[in-house]
Structure formats: structure tokens, C-alpha cells
A protein has these predicted regions:
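A short SAM/SAH-binding and catalytic strip from SAM-dependent methyltransferases
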Residues: 111-126
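Conserved class I S-adenosyl-L-methionine
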Residues: 2-48, 145-161
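A short acidic, Gly/Pro-enriched loop at the edge of an enzyme's catalytic core
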Residues: 101-113
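A short glycine-rich, Lys/Arg-flanked "PGG" loop and its adjoining helix->strand segment in the class I
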Residues: 128-140
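Nucleotide donor/acceptor-binding cores
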Residues: 50-52
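Class I SAM-dependent methyltransferase SAM/SAH-binding core
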Residues: 54, 60-102
Length: 161
């Protein structure tokens, strides 16, 4: 089990990795096709359009842009200050700088949460608590989408993250 200090250091290294590689990350993901994820998830949300959407780990805003283009009301949360600035400037929607381990989310606010390749950054010892917090920010019948990178069922990090 990681101590609070170790969790803080892990978060610092993870965010530092994205800060250092922000330009390459943006270039490498801007055209990444996740349309099958969008469609499967959006089709499962029942309320009337527009949906209030939380993009959990929005990065520079690729998915926020897509959701906004469909007429939805997206809000992003992101750990990287660089990505928060890029998303706010280029997308023009609410984007909050937030540590994924210390969330501050309103209750019953969102019709859906889109967590595309982000939950793997949360250490195993914290994931249940974070999932409860995400559940509590969903409206009744809200839907959480999450995807993760392929791996060998090992908790660990690549490079400095």
C-alpha cells in the first residue's frame, strides 16, 4: 500500500510526464479514432439531448471538441495544467485542473462520464473510492464509459508514469 507521500509523488511524476511530452501527446492523439467508443457510449445514455458530459482526463480536448460539436455540454477535468490551458482556449468549455486522486465533483450533475484511457493512472488502492466518487457525480441512470490500454494485468507504470 502506498503512503500519502508516495501517492503524491506518483501523481507528480505522472503529471510531469504529460507536461514534458504535451506537444508530442497532442500530435499523437489528435487523429486517434475512438468513434466506436463515442457511439457505443452515447447510444447508451437515455436522457434527452443535449447531455451533460464529464470528460475525465480530457487531455488537450479532442473528445471535448467532438462532444461539443454534437451539441452536448461537455466539462473536462485534467491533471496537466498545460492541457487544461490548451483545452480551455481551443474548445471554449469548462475545464478544471484536478488531481484524479483528490476529486472535487458535484453530486448528480452528469448524464455521462467519458474516461478514455485514464483510470489506469489511479493506483489500485484508490480505485474503489474514485469509482464511488464518479458514480456519485452521475445523474440517475447516468453512464460511465471507460477504456484502458492493453497490458498483462500488472499494476505499474511506463517510464516516469
Amino acid at each position: 500500500m502506498l503512503s500519502p507521500r508516495e501517492l503524491q509523488e506518483l501523481t507528480r511524476r505522472t503529471i510531469g510526464h504529460y507536461e514534458f511530452n504535451s506537444e508530442n501527446y497532442q500530435i499523437g492523439t489528435v487523429d486517434h479514432d475512438v468513434s466506436q467508443n463515442y457511439m457505443a457510449w452515447l447510444d447508451s445514455i437515455e436522457p434527452e439531448i443535449p447531455f451533460k458530459i464529464l470528460d475525465f482526463g480530457c487531455g488537450p480536448g479532442r473528445d471535448l471538441r467532438y462532444f461539443k460539436s454534437l451539441g452536448h455540454i461537455p466539462t473536462g477535468i485534467e491533471g496537466s495544467e498545460t492541457f487544461v490551458k490548451v483545452a480551455r482556449t481551443s474548445i471554449g468549455c469548462d475545464v478544471h485542473h484536478m488531481n484524479f486522486i483528490n476529486l472535487d465533483l458535484p453530486q448528480f450533475e452528469y448524464d455521462g462520464i467519458f474516461a478514455n484511457a485514464t483510470l489506469f493512472h489511479i493506483p489500485r488502492q484508490e480505485i474503489n473510492r474514485v469509482m464511488i466518487e464518479l458514480h456519485e457525480t452521475l445523474k440517475e441512470r447516468g453512464v460511465l464509459f471507460c477504456s484502458n490500454q492493453r497490458g498483462n494485468n500488472q499494476e505499474g507504470f511506463s517510464g516516469e508514469r
